[in-house]
Amino acid sequence: MVLEMKVIAFVGYPLSGKSTAAEVARELGLPVVVMGDVVREEAARRGLELTDENLGKVARELREKEGMDAIAKRCIPKIRELLKEHGVVVVDGIRGVAEVERFKKAFGDDFVLIAIECPLEVRFERVKMRKRSDDVSSIEELKERDRREESWGLKEAMEMADFTVENTGSYEDFVEKIRQILLKLAKNVEIEIRTKIHPTESEDKVLKAIRNIFPDAEIEISEEGEVYGRAYSLDRFRELLRKQRILDTARSEILKGRNGKEVTIYLNKQTATVSRINFCDENAVLSPIKVTFRLNNIPFSRFLDYIAPETKDGRPVKEIDKL
C-alpha cells in the first residue's frame, strides 16, 4: 500500500510565528526542515557571525549565484529522505515565489503552503522576547527586513498559500490553530486519554500508569479528579503488545472499538502501573483508562495492521514498520 506523502510549508513575514508553528509540528512528532538553517550553516562555514546583516548577505549571494530557489533546492534532498521515513515533513521559512514553485515542481499536489499573517507592530514586540542573535534591534530594521524579503517575492508567495492563519490573538490561540490544521493535513494519530482518580487511589500511581503506556502524554487533572491526557507516540503501546504476545486480543479490541475515524479501548489501570496492558470493559471497577485513537489521513486497516497485525502460531504474519 502506498500512503499519501505530504510536505507542509509555512510562509510569513519575519517574526510572524513560523518558528512557533514549527515547534507545534515537532510536538506532534512531525520532522521539521528549517530553511533558514541552510543560510546559518553557510554563514558559519564562512566563519561569519550570525547577525541579521551577515545572514541577509549570505542569502542574497546564494540566490544570485544559484538562483532565487537556491535555498529550496538545498533543502529538497533532506526533505525527500525524511519523507521516506515519516511520510510527512514540515518546512519552516519560505521566503519567495521561486521557492514555492521549486517545491511544487518537486512534490506536486503533495505540497501544501500555509501563510501566517501578523501585523508589523505585533511582530516587533516579539523581537524583545525571542532574543535571537540574528534578530533586528529596531522597528526600522524590521521594516527593512520586510522589504528585503518582499524583493524575493514574499508577498506573492503568501498569496499562493492554500491556507491562511492569522496570528493576532494569544499565543495559546495561535498554537491551537496550527495544531488543528496540522492534524488535518498530516498522517497522524492523536491519542486522547481519560480516567478518574478515586479517593482511594494515589494520583502519582494513576499518572505513572498512563505514562507507562504513553510516555509522551500531556496530562491535566480537574479538581474533581477527572484526568485528561493527550499523546502522539504509539511506540511504547506497540512494544508492550508484542512483549506480552497479546496481538490477537489487541486486534479484536481495536475492531470492537472502531467508530469511523476513531478507535476506543479500555485499559486496566492497576496493571498499567507495572507496565502491563490488560484490556477491560468500560464499566470496570475504579474507572479504566479510556484511550481514544483519532486517525488523521491514515486508513483504519493500516492503523490496525501497524498496531496489531494478524498472527500465525503466535507470531505476526507481516509487520509494518511505520504508518
Curated annotation (Swiss-Prot):
Residues 186-323 are annotated as: UPF0201. Residues 1-185 are annotated as: UPF0200. The keyword Nucleotide-binding applies. InterPro entries: NTP_hydrolase-rel, P-loop_NTPase, PAB1135-like, Ribosomal_uL5_dom_sf. One of its GO terms (molecular function) is ATP binding. The keyword Electron transport does not apply. It holds the Pfam family RNA_binding. Keywords: ATP-binding, Nucleotide-binding. SUPFAM superfamilies: P-loop containing nucleoside triphosphate hydrolases, RL5-like. ATP binds at G12, Y13, P14, L15, S16, G17, K18, S19. It comes from the Archaea. In the N-terminal section; belongs to the UPF0200 family. In the C-terminal section; belongs to the UPF0201 family. This is UPF0200/UPF0201 protein AF_1395. It comes from Archaeoglobus fulgidus (strain ATCC 49558 / DSM 4304 / JCM 9628 / NBRC 100126 / VC-16).
